[in-house]
Regions:
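Catalytic Walker B motif of ABC-type/P-loop ATPase nucleotide-binding domains
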Residues: 134-138
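Conserved structural motif at the start of ABC-family nucleotide-binding domains
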Residues: 13-16
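Conserved ABC ATPase signature
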Residues: 109-118
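The feature captures the beta-strand-to-loop junction immediately N-terminal to the Walker
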Residues: 30-32
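Conserved ABC ATPase "signature" region
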Residues: 91-106
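Hydrophobic anchor residue at the start of the ABC signature
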Residues: 123, 162
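Q-loop/switch helix immediately C-terminal to the Walker
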Residues: 68, 73-92
């Protein structure tokens, strides 16, 4: 990432973000709610267009897990997983189901699941996608302590397999060599125009 600006509408809220992320590395984004972590992740995922700066990802397959679980509530857990498997062209998801301990709820409609169970089903999309780069926005939301430990284990395994992760979280990660980024270092008043924004840095 080189000299990246992130926008809400026409106004930049983050500026001049630069960092390198290699295979097997994890970056943790820190900052209070509303500081721009979600906007940065969506920009990295190209959901929000890049207006200024560069994102060079060497054509890495990327999977974004946001605040929303993106589940079809009237379908069963298995039907949701099968839907994602078809999208990502992954014919075998049995190991992913087992890893997340979803076997017992495969035939349960998602609507009947607890918040924590829904989050676990959503996490399965990361494994099913086989993406090298995971962009995670508070992925441990609604998870209990045991499942947070499971999430840490899954992330550590992904890194060992030469994956890469950028995560926004308020939790302490039990993973070695986390590279922290304080997002508030790049924060600007979102009511400042781009011309005012750049002029402010030039001062």
């Amino acid at each position: 990432v080189e000299n990246l600006y992130c926008f809400r509408g026409e106004f930049p809220i983050l500026a001049r973000i630069s960092f390198d992320l290699d295979y097997g590395q994890i970056i943790s984004l820190h900052g209070p709610n509303g500081s721009g972590k979600t906007t940065l992740l969506k920009t990295l995922a190209q959901i929000i267009p890049t207006e200024k700066g560069k994102i060079i990802n060497n054509s890495l397959e990327t999977c974004l897990m946001g605040h929303e679980n993106c589940l079809k509530l009237d379908l069963t857990v298995f039907e949701n997983l099968k839907f994602w498997a078809d999208i990502y062209k992954n014919p075998s998801i049995n190991s992913d189901i087992s890893t997340l301990g979803l076997v017992q709820i495969l035939d349960v409609p998602v609507r009947q699941l607890s918040a924590g169970q829904k989050r676990k089903v959503s996490l399965a999309r990361l494994l099913i996608s086989k993406s090298k780069l995971w962009l995670l926005d508070e992925p441990d939301a609604s998870l209990d302590e045991d499942n947070r430990k499971l999430l840490n284990k899954i992330m550590a395994s992904h890194l060992l397999e030469n994956g890469a992760i950028i995560i926004a979280t308020h939790s302490t990660l039990n993973i070695k060599n986390v590279l922290p980024i304080d997002i508030t270092r790049y924060k600007r008043d979102e009511n400042t125009s781009i011309d005012q924004f750049v002029h402010g840095f030039q001062k």
